[in-house]
Amino acid sequence: LKVPDLPLPESYXXALNLAXD
């Protein structure tokens, strides 16, 4: 699972949500 290094946990989540899709 690859996610961008974002400073905000919310953005991370979002990234995880997109990756997951």
UniProtKB/Swiss-Prot annotation:
Gene Ontology CC: extracellular region
Keywords: Neurotoxin, Secreted, Toxin
Main subcellular location: secreted
Subcellular location: Secreted
Entry superkingdom: Eukaryota
Gene Ontology molecular function: toxin activity
Record keyword Secreted present: yes
Tissue expression summary: Expressed by the venom gland.
Family of this protein: Belongs to the scolopendra toxin 8 family.
Protein name: Scolopendra 7997.01 Da toxin
UniProt source species: Scolopendra viridicornis nigra
